[in-house]
Each structure stands twice: as structure tokens, then as C-alpha cells.
């Protein structure tokens, strides 16, 4: 199925939607309505996803268990609260391509990012810079800047934001490689999104990680996969 077979881009889009094996999943979510009462075209899933129709039912169940069981809900609720994260392990592992033993669902995204940087961002006077893509999600930027400041450095000089070339919207791999070659001795951490939440650019994580290891053995890298799993 190719675009030239259709009289307009709209016809092509409609045909593709009709043949999408996942199209029925659309009916599982609640869509905000426009001023004229029609369902809006929602393209903000990378920021806040639509509410699943079943969300209220699941929340009501937890409130019911809380009301009837109190503290005993940690172990006796319909979905016991203490081991609740285990209910999500198998699905999350499949989503991110990991083994279940490698996955745990916990905290908020920003808290987890802080925990990762506490472990992997070990700045020294000679090597203290962090590399992120320009236009990274705001809460990610705040976390990075706060970690830099916590260690006594200035985000104005210790944060490197990679930007696309003028007139382009996506970063080139060679630009990242060039930065590592030029400033690798000053960089303590490279922190990129698997997919850029604003542009949709997907990075070749395996290749970039290989280049990092070849060029700077002491350089750590973290991949933020939140945008890659919610777009």
C-alpha cells in the first residue's frame, strides 16, 4: 500500500487506519472533545496519555479495599499493595525488551532518573559534564541540573545540550561522535532519550553505546526510555 494509489493524503491515512490491526484499541480510551462536541485528534501521548476507560474501575477497587481493609490492604486487597509492582513485571519486561528479573516498576520517572544519576554520575574536577539533547523533557532537564549543582558544579558550564544543525530537526549520530572525540575527557555522563519526545527521533542506542565505549572507556551513558514507551 503506497501513497500514489490514493487521490489525497487524507484518503491514504483513512485507508491505513482501516487496515491497522491495533485500531480497535482506540475504543479503550476516553478522548477530550472539541468545542463542537467532536472527539479531538490527540497527539500529546508523549506528554500525558489518554485515560483508559477502565481506569476509574481500577481506582474504585483500590479505594474500596482501602475503606474496607485499611492497613490490611497491603496484603489482603484484591491486588495486594505490598507486591503490587510484581503484577506489572511481565508486561513491562516485554515492552522494553528486557528479562523480567531485570525490571522493577517503582517511583516516578524523575525520582528514578535521580537514582540512576546518583549511581552513575561521579564527577571529578576534570570530568564533570553531562550531555543531553536540546529540548529534552523539562523535568529531565531539572533533574540533570540539580544533580550538577548538588555536586558543586555550575549547570551553565557543566551541561552540554546537543542541538540539530541549523535547518534540521534531528541530531546526527556523527555530531554525537564528534562531541565525544572533542570533549570526551571532560564528559562524565551522556544522558539521551531512546526516542526524543518532541521530534520522535529514534537513536541507534547500540551503535552510540559502542562509540562511547571506543572513545571514552570511563564515560557512562544512560538512556531515558520513557518517551520510547509512551509515544
Model-derived segments and their meaning:
Residues 1-231:
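Pyridoxal 5′-phosphate
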Amino acid at each position: 500500500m503506497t501513497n500514489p494509489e490514493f487521490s489525497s493524503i487524507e484518503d491514504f491515512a483513512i485507508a491505513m487506519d482501516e487496515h491497522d490491526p491495533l485500531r480497535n484499541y482506540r475504543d479503550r480510551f476516553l478522548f477530550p472533545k472539541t468545542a463542537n462536541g467532536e472527539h479531538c485528534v490527540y497527539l500529546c501521548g508523549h506528554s500525558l496519555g489518554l485515560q483508559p476507560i477502565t481506569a476509574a474501575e481500577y481506582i474504585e477497587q483500590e479505594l474500596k479495599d482501602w475503606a474496607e481493609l485499611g492497613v490490611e490492604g497491603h496484603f489482603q486487597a484484591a491486588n495486594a499493595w505490598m507486591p503490587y509492582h510484581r503484577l506489572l513485571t511481565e508486561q513491562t519486561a516485554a515492552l522494553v525488551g528486557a528479562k523480567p528479573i531485570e525490571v522493577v516498576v517503582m517511583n516516578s520517572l524523575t525520582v528514578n532518573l535521580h537514582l540512576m544519576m546518583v549511581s552513575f554520575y561521579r564527577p571529578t574536577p576534570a570530568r564533570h559534564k553531562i550531555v543531553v539533547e536540546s529540548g529534552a523533557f523539562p523535568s529531565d532537564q531539572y533533574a540533570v541540573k540539580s544533580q550538577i549543582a548538588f555536586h558543586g558544579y555550575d549547570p551553565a558550564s557543566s551541561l552540554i545540550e546537543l542541538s540539530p544543525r541549523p535547518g534540521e530537526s534531528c541530531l546526527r549520530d556523527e555530531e554525537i561522535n564528534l562531541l565525544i572525540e572533542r570533549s570526551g575527557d571532560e564528559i562524565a555522563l551522556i544522558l539521551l532519550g531512546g526516542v526524543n519526545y518532541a521530534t520522535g527521533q529514534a537513536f541507534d542506542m547500540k551503535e552510540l553505546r559502542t562509540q562511547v565505549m571506543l572513545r571514552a572507556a570511563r564515560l557512562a551513558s544512560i538512556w531515558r526510555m520513557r518517551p520510547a514507551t509512551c509515544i
